[in-house]
Amino acid sequence: MRVVLKLGTSVLTAGTDRLHRPRLVDLLRGIAEVRAAGHEVVLVTSGAVLAGWEALGFPPRERTLAEKQLLAAVGQGRLMHLYASIADLYGMPVAQVLLTADDFRDRTRYLNARTTLEGCLTRGVLPIINENDTVAVEQIKVGDNDTLSAFVANLVEADLLVILTDAPGLYTADPRIDPTATLIPVVERVTPEVWALAGGAGSHRGTGGMHTKLQAAEIATRAGTPVVIAPGDAENALARIVRGEALGTRFLAHGSRLEARKRWILAEIATGRLLLDEGAVRAVRERGGSLLPAGITTVHGPFERGHTVRLLAPDGSEVARGLTRYRADDLKRIAGRHSRDIEAVLGFTYGPEAVHRDDLVRL
């Protein structure tokens, strides 16, 4: 089994204001146990900003982008050194892999990243992945490591994504304020009702909350990878989950795995939205057809030709994602028009489809 494990800042600190070394030892021991049982593990970790904050003597936190990037630059090396020194105790070589959203958006970089990670796994190296915060401005940020872990699970075609956090899983209500709240052991699909249970932001030490974890679960399960959100302080959590023990909340995968190219389309961050009429929704969802300009009612950009866009039904629900053949400004001019009018309106044509069916992932 190939497993992607995501560790958030709240897990790495064990409730303190600094990286908790004993917790890291426990977590890496668990990874070593799972690897010894014949499984492959890819680790997605937070903690670089916190490690930098710790290294600089806990200065007041302004939370500006410049400060976060400074702290990440100071802390990333220290975080990796800590991981490497502990992993050495268990005979695990490690590799640092820093990614940005552009590495998932660009097909060549996406394939290069996958080749690197496959090489690590083939040679028994533990890849340790973080977002490259020192260079990732807002436009090229994945945004949080929960989402990053889902993209990585997609990238390596993982059999399971495990997100360890400071919560036991997804509850029917906030257990901190509602004593009747109960843990939800299995979620078949991330519905609007499930989203309503997500609550607000995460801890003051990290950037993620249950909302971002649900987003990660939705991305991964759509691509065919099941997800488990479980407590990071549970003893031997990773090994227990891999063995199939019920721990936390398990999100079931949607059908079979997507082919590699469609995994890439789903992994790319959608930069725009196309609102469709009912006829176009039926053509895409029920008949597996392409999206024609005639079926588009509204275009929300900006985006360029070849970018991933979300296709939405009139009620706002997402029907599919796909690669657009036209940039936003051009689609706005031909939306609602017959395909035969494209060249007359634009002065050129890239074909009759706004999004070809071969470039669509139906959801």
Curated annotation (Swiss-Prot):
One GO CC term, this protein: cytosol
Classification of source organism: Bacteria, Thermotogati, Deinococcota, Deinococci, Deinococcales
Enzyme class per UniProt: transferase
Binding site for substrate: 46, 133, 145
EC number in record: 2.7.2.11
Function: Catalyzes the transfer of a phosphate group to glutamate to form L-glutamate 5-phosphate.
Entry-linked InterPro entries: AceGlu_kinase-like_sf (IPR036393), Asp/Glu/Uridylate_kinase (IPR001048), G5K_ProB (IPR041739), Glu/AcGlu_kinase (IPR001057), Glu_5kinase (IPR011529), Glu_5kinase/COase_Synthase (IPR005715), Glutamate_5-kinase_CS (IPR019797), PUA (IPR002478)
Name used for this protein in its record: Glutamate 5-kinase
One biological process term in Gene Ontology: L-proline biosynthetic process
Location of the protein in the cell: Cytoplasm
Pathway the protein acts in: Amino-acid biosynthesis; L-proline biosynthesis; L-glutamate 5-semialdehyde from L-glutamate: step 1/2
Record: residues binding ATP: 6, 165-166, 207-213
NCBIfam families: proB
Record flagged with keyword DNA-binding: no
Native organism: Deinococcus geothermalis (strain DSM 11300 / CIP 105573 / AG-3a)
GO MF terms, alphabetically ordered: ATP binding; glutamate 5-kinase activity; RNA binding
Domain PUA, chain residue ranges per copy: 271-349
Catalytic reaction list: L-glutamate + ATP = L-glutamyl 5-phosphate + ADP
Main subcellular location of this protein, as a coarse class: cytoplasm
Family matches, as Pfam families: AA_kinase, PUA
Keywords: Amino-acid biosynthesis, ATP-binding, Cytoplasm, Kinase, Nucleotide-binding, Proline biosynthesis, Transferase
Family of this protein: Belongs to the glutamate 5-kinase family.
PROSITE patterns in the cross-refs: GLUTAMATE_5_KINASE, PUA
